[in-house]
């Protein structure tokens, strides 16, 4: 896809189109909008695109995003934000990034302000750090640490919001030997943790979740279809072949009734017909 026009562009200015430019490996390196000098038909634009690498006709072009691949060497169009090691996370990054997106520069719509986001990888191609400009005019940095299986066991988000304030959000996760989440902890600026835990049955289905002090149980029927969730704030039931409100029974997996209740309020129900 090299050029497209949506309904808003057509209605506002029939000469305005969205465009995409590609590199020699057929990857998008620039996207934006162009206002053509004259109104062109689809056939004329298709002919230009099919016969020349310079397929965008004359007009005023406004780039909205540039993408850099394969290298951490900045170009005229795309800067690169520096990697900074974070204690407890990767001390370095891989430079073998052929085929990977390394940096993206994006325009804030309606302005001449650009935001740059650079992504760093380990030698397995996993993201270990992203460094990006934020709308406050400062830098945000996200670090990730993995276990041998590739699960994220730690993540740290650092967002500088003023010259004197940086907010830090930290996550820690644990998994079982099948890669399923067992527990997670989140802290903001070193404060009290928000915790969650998960319990599974013998066939691997999630049957219990606990968020802080609120516990939710999850039920299934013998076919593995979800039949209900229950916690103090909210309860719900799904019925299939066993409706209680006069709806026709469904034996093929369609839901016949959905009942829910908030706290101690009266239960409500939908019945479905197919």
Set out the residue ranges of the language-model regions.
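General structural concept
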Residues: 4-7, 14
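Hydrophobic or amphipathic alpha-helical targeting/insertion segments
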Residues: 12-55
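Acidic/glycine-rich beta-solenoid
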Residues: 14, 61-63, 75-119, 127-274
